[in-house]
Amino acid sequence: MTRLEKIFKQTSAKKKILVTYTVAGDPSLKTSKKILDDLVSSGADILEIGVPFSDPMSEGPVIQKAHERALKKNIEFKDILNICKQIRKKNSSVPIVLMGYMNSFLSLKNKLAKELFLAGVDGVIVVDLPYDESKSFFENLRQEDIDLIRLISPTTDSKRLKQMLASSSGYLYYVSLKGITGAELKNFDEVKKKVKKIKSLTHLPVVVGFGIKDAKTAKKMASFSDGIVAVSYTHLRAHE
C-alpha cells in the first residue's frame, strides 16, 4: 500500500484530508524546508509542493508572486528534489506531491520517475499535461509507483473525464472554479454536484482546491469531498 493509499484510508465523515500547497523556494529553500516541516507538525496530511515556473498560467496574483520570488533565487528542479529527500529522511509517512508545469518535469527526461522515487516523492500534478502525452507519461511514472494526479475542472465533460480517469492514480484534484487560484468561490451546490458525479465514476479519492480562503469554506467543501487543498499562509502574508 502506498503512502497516499494509507492516508486516504483514514478518511471518514469526521476526518478529511488536509493537503497544503507551498511553492518551493519562497522565500528561500531553507525557509521552505522549515515551513514544510512545520506544516506536517501542525497536521498537514499531504504536502503539495509547487515547482516554480516562469508562466504559472493557472495561478492568481498571490501564487504568481510566490513563483517569481522563488525563480529570483535561481531554484532548480534538483533543489526541490533535495528538499523532498530531507523531508523523507525526517518523516517516512507523509505523502509528498509535486505540482508544476510540463517543462519543469521534462527537464529530467527519461530519468524523471526514478529521480522522483529516489527523492521520496509520491505523486505529481502537471497543470498543462497534454492529453496525447498523458498515457505514456502515466505509464512511465507508474513504473516507479509514482502517482499521476489529474486536475479536473468544472468544464471537463463526461467523455473527457472517463478518458482522464484511465490515466489517473493516487487521488483526483477537483478545481472548484473556472479561472485562476485565489478567486472567490460562490457556487457550492454546483461543486458538490460535480464532485458527486466524479466519485460515482471512480474509486479514487477526490480533493477540492481553488477558492478556499477560510475555515468556513474549507468545512463546507470537506463535507462532500475526501479533503481540501489549502495554500500556505506564508505566501498570503508575503503578498500583503
Report each predicted region and the residues it spans.
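Catalytic cores of alpha/beta
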Residues: 32-37, 159-162, 212-225
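N-terminal amphipathic alpha-helix/helix-capping segment at the start of soluble metabolic enzymes
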Residues: 1-19
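Conserved small/polar residues in nucleotide/adenosyl-binding loops
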Residues: 234-240
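Glycine/Thr-rich beta-alpha phosphate-binding loop at enzyme active sites
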Residues: 63, 73, 161-200
